[in-house]
Design a protein with these regions (language model features):
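Cytochrome P450
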Residues: 1-219
Length: 219
């Protein structure tokens, strides 16, 4: 990241480093060891089995309600009406984001991920930078509130990330904020694509689809 081209637009702005570039250079997925190893260890330490298991009843209820809505409407779009709604709620629950605040999350994630396209347009770049800035501004408020009023560390991953420490090491404020953005982006695209690709695969392999339908518990 110190190579000359990275010191020029679109990686920099008149005010300094562009928000997208700052996000990617501080995000877990775009760094190598030893930084990657250290940050990964601290994040995984916050994602306890108990916290994950505590989300299961709410996730089952969410999936049932989304499917019920599609059935009531007489059909729907698998991605728009089902798959894309799941990761936003999961990450929202992990970080204990109030439900009233969750509407912008998907748009921010899509814009930030869209800015990774190889043929990036100026409009995509501007939207990606703006989305990083808006998301970080929201997270700063959320983290400040959680510092004053911590959640239950057994279930609130954000509180664990804030309070977490291993061998005297903890996430810096920048690492905390940027990797909360990463958690949303990482869970959003992968989960949505997995559900969509799984449906396509089941359509292309009817024998496997029939096997699944006769033994749903095996799924």
């Amino acid at each position: 990241y110190t190579h000359a081209p990275f010191n020029q637009p679109p990686y920099t702005t008149p005010g300094g480093v562009a928000p997208l570039f700052e996000h990617h250079t501080n995000s877990l997925v775009f760094n190598d060891p030893p930084l990657h190893t250290r940050v990964r260890r601290l994040i995984m330490g916050a994602l306890t089995r108990r916290a994950i298991e505590a989300m299961e009843p709410g996730l089952v209820q969410l999936v049932d309600s989304l499917l019920d809505r599609i059935e009531t409407q007489g059909g729907g779009d698998l991605i728009e009406d089902f798959a894309s709604a799941i990761p936003v709620e999961i990450i929202g629950n992990l970080l204990d984001v109030p439900h009233a605040d969750r509407e912008p999350l998907r748009g921010w994630s899509l814009a930030i991920l869209g800015a990774l396209e190889p043929s990036l347009t100026p409009e995509q770049e501007a939207l990606g930078n703006r989305s990083v800035s808006e998301f970080l501004a929201y997270l700063r408020q959320l983290v400040a509130q959680r510092r004053q009023h911590p959640g239950d560390p057994e279930h609130d991953v954000l509180t664990r990330l804030i309070q977490g420490e291993e061998n005297g090491d903890a996430l810096s404020e920048v690492e905390l904020l940027q990797n909360c953005v990463f958690l949303l982006n990482a869970g959003h695209e992968t989960t949505t694509n997995l559900i969509g690709n799984a449906l396509i695969s089941l359509q292309e392999w009817p024998a496997q689809r029939q096997q699944l339908m006769t033994d749903l518990k095996a799924a």
